[in-house]
């Protein structure tokens, strides 16, 4: 067994781990990234899922990736090419739809099909979302202040947050409070009249969420559109040419030019400890690698309770970590299609604006709530709410044959644990068929053009990508699991109770999504401590 030594070992080659490695290398540290899978990228990868068809296998949209990370790591130089998705399409099984584009006149006419007032209400609503979202976004690339024993920089950061909030007027402060601690349905009902628009807004807060629309505190997810941007356009979402793996490939290439060592097929079994300090890791192969610091891109429960072990942690801290709520009730499907999906509500001879859109198959607010309640009872939602894309319409590099397509589906709500003693390995095919049958109501030619599919259940997301209970955020995004409490007040500044061990993944502030923010922030903290 070989023994090697580095300044820092990064556990996990996902986008945050690679981000951390880049910034540490920029600080002249010797860094080794250890990835357990055969490919780097974590959940942000592109792979062939059916012969001749490639796609973003897990993470599938870009918006939250911080512009600072893109520019500082020169990702575009290494192949990162975002594609703006300006359109949104909301079809339902009754034949109704909303199709929103870059044309204000077009959008006003679309909303007028359902309401005489919601268009103006939406403009005012999105104004508040943007204002509050700016305050949230301003904290993403900052280390959250500790809840006690704050230093001068922490106090200044807290003062700045207060100053930002003071700039808001009375109405803006009221809306901010609603977003931070309110229930989505209360906000939605207070703003909008039509069932269609209410469903559209409700759908926007579900992809990374696992909460009732009636749950106080669940409205934080409604701010995600304001925090993101593509090509400088606030609130926009997009695709990446070649799939999300192009992001992590660019990050890896950037890191390797800085001298970072990246190893795949190198699963870490435990973190080595000596004299109350983390000193290295042991791989499943038995190989030991040593370092002065460890940055864990794994989720907090895996990091602390499995790799480190409760014996090396304060008892109360370990109990708190074990109580972190993890689960997003998400199921991913990738469809291989021999032709273009034809929507019953909007047939077309070729790709239309609705094909170049983020597509949300949602019936109503009640549909979303019923899906949530079913999942809570351990039953896959029938039908699920589905967030979809047809990325091959704007990126023909994803398929080998002209005219063929891939379709991405994020299906909600799908519980990690099934009731009645059922398990996902036996239920996967049945649930997949139920999803396809539901989509066929709106895409009549789907069965005809479907040549294959990949289904990743919550259990698959855990096994394949290390997402605990299928949680795409490493821990639910709820008020008591955010900011200075993410994942715990004693680890919210990326340092942990174990000397030399840091967190750099989505389980740390500011949370999930392909942002690069936890990775960048953790690296800054490690470098700051390195100089002491």
Q: Where would I find each of the regions flagged by the language model?
A:
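Active-site/ligand-binding neighborhood in enzyme catalytic cores
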Residues: 130-258, 467-481
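Mid-domain catalytic core of redox enzymes
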Residues: 239-240, 260, 267-400
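FAD-dependent oxidoreductase catalytic-site/capping-region signature
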Residues: 384-480
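Structural core of flavin- and non-heme-iron oxidoreductases
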Residues: 1-39, 43-44, 111, 117, ...
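A conserved FAD-binding loop/helix module that cradles the flavin
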Residues: 506-527
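A glycine-rich dinucleotide-binding beta-alpha-beta segment and adjacent secondary-structure elements
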Residues: 194, 198-214, 380-389, 445-509
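Extreme N-terminal leader/targeting segments of oxidoreductases
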Residues: 1-8, 26-27, 482-484, 488-489, ...
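N-terminal glycine-rich phosphate/pyrophosphate-binding loop and immediately adjacent elements
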Residues: 3-148, 474, 521
């Amino acid at each position: 067994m070989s023994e090697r030594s580095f300044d820092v070992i990064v556990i996990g080659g996902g986008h945050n781990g690679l981000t951390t490695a880049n910034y540490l290398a920029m600080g002249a540290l010797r860094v080794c990234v250890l990835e357990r899978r055969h490919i780097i990228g974590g959940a942000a990868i592109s792979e062939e899922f059916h012969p001749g068809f490639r796609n973003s296998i897990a993470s599938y949209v870009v918006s939250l990736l911080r512009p600072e990370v893109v520019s500082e790591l020169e990702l575009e130089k290494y192949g990162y090419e975002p594609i703006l998705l300006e359109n949104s399409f909301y079809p339902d099984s009754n034949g109704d739809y909303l199709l929103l584009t870059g044309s204000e006149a077009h959008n006003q006419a679309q909303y007028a099909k359902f309401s005489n007032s919601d268009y103006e209400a939406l403009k005012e609503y999105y104004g508040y979302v943007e204002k509050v979202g700016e305050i949230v976004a301003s904290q993403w690339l900052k280390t959250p202040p500790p809840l006690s024993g704050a230093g001068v920089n922490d106090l200044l950061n807290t003062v700045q947050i207060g100053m930002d909030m003071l700039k808001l007027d009375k109405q803006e402060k009221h809306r901010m409070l609603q977003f931070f601690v309110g229930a989505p349905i209360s906000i939605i009902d207070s703003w909008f009249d039509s069932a269609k628009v209410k469903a559209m807004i409700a759908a926007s807060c579900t992809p990374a969420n696992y909460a009732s629309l009636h749950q106080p505190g669940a409205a934080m997810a409604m701010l995600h559109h304001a925090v993101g941007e593509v090509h400088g356009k606030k609130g926009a979402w997009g695709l990446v040419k070649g799939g999300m793996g192009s992001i992590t490939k660019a990050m890896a290439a950037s890191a390797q030019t800085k001298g970072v060592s990246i190893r795949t097929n190198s699963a870490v079994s435990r973190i080595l400890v000596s004299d109350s300090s983390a000193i290295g890791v042991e791989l499943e192969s038995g190989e030991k690698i040593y370092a002065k610091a460890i940055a864990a891109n794994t989720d907090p429960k895996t990091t602390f309770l499995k790799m480190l072990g409760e014996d090396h942690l304060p008892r109360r801290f370990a109990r708190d970590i074990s109580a972190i709520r993890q689960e997003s009730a998400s199921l991913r499907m990738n469809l291989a299609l021999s032709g273009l999906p034809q929507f019953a509500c909007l047939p077309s001879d070729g790709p239309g604006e609705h094909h170049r859109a983020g597509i949300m198959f949602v019936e109503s607010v009640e549909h979303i709530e019923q899906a949530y309640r079913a999942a809570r009872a351990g039953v896959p939602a029938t039908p699920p709410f589905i967030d979809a894309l047809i990325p091959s319409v704007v990126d023909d590099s994803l398929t080998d044959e002209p005219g063929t397509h891939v379709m991405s589906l994020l299906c909600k709500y799908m519980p990690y644990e099934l009731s009645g003693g059922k398990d996902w390995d036996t239920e996967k095919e049945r649930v997949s068929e139920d999803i396809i049958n539901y989509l066929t109501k709106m895409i009549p030619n789907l069965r005809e053009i479907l040549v294959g599919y990949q289904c990743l259940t919550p259990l698959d997301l855990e096994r394949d990508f290390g997402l605990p209970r299928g949680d795409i955020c490493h821990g639910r995004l709820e008020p008591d699991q955010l900011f200075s409490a993410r994942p715990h007040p004693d680890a919210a500044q990326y340092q942990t109770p174990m000397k030399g061990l840091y967190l750099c993944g989505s389980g740390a502030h500011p949370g999930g999504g392909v942002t690069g923010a936890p990775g960048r922030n953790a690296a800054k903290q490690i470098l700051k401590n390195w100089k002491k």
